[in-house]
């Protein structure tokens, strides 16, 4: 019996830019499912067809693009939180078998691990978990230094909403 090949989807950073109280119910539900409950929160998701459909539905409330490993490592270092609102530290990562933030970020972007965060994890002897246990699945960011162009126009039209490709990394660095 042959082992099935796993599909490796690209990793996307999704940042919520609009926090309108009168958001339509279906959009609010999709933002909630993506765990984007407040303005300037970010999630990192795989580009599977179901997730991409959700992102397309909330395209007028978020900006998104491909995240690079060094940007993800920086986000984990500066904005990563574990349950109890404690900062994610290098000691905590080493406790679970990871040597650095960069190692986790590279493994996630390359598709070696499927998820960044998971709840309770029972480690087996000498085995590293396939995630960071108890990591919060979203990152709270600051408003961007230098401000935004427009949260009413799409990126291609000179605004900030929608798909922006690898340029999302510049925006995230301005928000750290």
From Swiss-Prot:
The keyword Isomerase does not apply. One of its GO terms (molecular function) is RNA binding. Disulfide bonds: none annotated. Gene3D superfamilies: 1.10.15.30, Ribosomal protein L30, ferredoxin-like fold domain. GO terms for cellular component: cytosolic large ribosomal subunit. The keyword tRNA processing does not apply. Keywords: Ribonucleoprotein, Ribosomal protein. Belongs to the universal ribosomal protein uL30 family. Part of the 50S ribosomal subunit. This is Large ribosomal subunit protein uL30. It comes from Pyrobaculum arsenaticum (strain DSM 13514 / JCM 11321 / PZ6). The gene is rpl30.
């Amino acid at each position: 019996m042959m082992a099935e090949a796993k599909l490796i989807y690209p990793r996307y950073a999704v940042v919520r830019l609009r926090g309108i109280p009168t958001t339509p119910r279906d959009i609010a539900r999709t933002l909630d499912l993506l765990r984007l409950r407040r303005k300037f929160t970010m999630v990192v998701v795989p580009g599977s067809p179901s997730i991409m459909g959700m992102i397309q539905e909330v395209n007028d409330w978020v900006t998104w693009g491909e995240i690079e490993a060094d940007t993800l490592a920086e986000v984990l270092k500066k904005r990563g939180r574990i349950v109890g609102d404690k900062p994610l530290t290098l000691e905590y990562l080493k406790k679970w078998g990871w040597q650095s933030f960069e190692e986790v970020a590279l493994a996630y972007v390359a598709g070696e691990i499927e998820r960044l965060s998971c709840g309770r994890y029972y480690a087996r002897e000498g085995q590293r978990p396939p995630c960071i246990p108890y990591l919060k699945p979203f990152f709270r960011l600051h408003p961007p230094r230098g401000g935004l162009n427009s949260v009413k126009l799409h990126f291609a039209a000179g605004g900030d909403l929608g798909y922006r490709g690898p340029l999302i990394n510049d925006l995230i660095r301005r928000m750290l």
